[in-house]
A protein has these predicted regions:
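A conserved mid-domain beta-alpha-beta active-site/ligand-binding segment of alpha/beta enzyme cores
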Residues: 81-92, 178-204
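Positively charged, lysine/arginine-rich intrinsically disordered segments
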Residues: 208-212
């Protein structure tokens, strides 16, 4: 299970905690990134529970956050000669997106904790692009996604397994205009060469049970 979320998110919702607890009981391998925010909070929660079936993905020489040294440290190779990926001594957003894409490819399904917009330090609206990309990259591979949409917590964890349903229920009805504009532009520019992965029906039922 690939767990991701907005960097700006500070807390893990109770519904998500329950889902992660159920994943641990089933001994699923949990894939998580190394960013602050949700990544770090999920790591800390799994560390506190002494859960070992965890893989932390990163692009640098070592993870920025790595709560348990017994976990799998999974580095995604990035060409540091490419300024789109490594500039001024730092890995770029594009490099981090390669890491996230690898996690989407490796996972069987995903759980996303998402607030689609926040205000940056200049007071302008900023779209949480990484989590949205993760949702899209999972869905186009026919992989289930459980989405906890932070602005509407009463909806709990919403379940999706195709792009059309996600667009109808979330993009068209819930998100801010800036997010909607970004999403359709991203979708337009996305590669048409993504290979689809069909998941056995038995796995679908088991995975969906986590998002009750």
């Amino acid at each position: 299970m690939f767990i991701s979320g907005s960097i700006s998110s500070k807390e893990i919702p109770d519904d998500v905690v329950k889902s992660v607890d159920e994943s641990r009981r089933k001994n699923y391998t949990i894939l998580v990134g190394d960013a602050r925010g949700i990544d770090k909070n999920i790591q800390d929660m799994l560390k506190a529970d002494n859960y070992k079936n965890v893989e932390v993905y990163h692009v640098g020489p070592s993870p920025r956050n790595f709560s348990d040294r017994e976990w799998v440290d999974k580095r995604i190779p990035v060409d540091i000669e490419d300024e789109k990926l490594f500039k001024n001594g730092k890995y770029t957003r594009e490099a981090q997106m390669l890491k996230d894409k690898a996690m989407s490819d490796d996972a069987d399904f995903g759980l996303v904790i998402w607030k689609d917009t926040s205000k940056n330090r200049f007071g302008n609206i900023s779209v949480s692009k990484g989590s949205l990309n993760n949702i899209y990259n999972l869905l186009v591979q026919n992989k289930y996604v459980g989405l906890f949409y932070i602005p509407n917590p009463e909806k709990g964890i919403m379940k999706f397994n195709d792009v059309v349903e996600f667009e109808e229920r979330v993009i068209e009805k819930l998100v801010q205009k800036e997010t909607k504009d970004y999403y359709y532009n991203m979708k337009k520019n996305a590669s048409n060469s993504k290979a689809e992965k069909i998941i056995p029906e038995s796995s679908n039922t088991e995975q969906l049970s986590l998002f009750s």
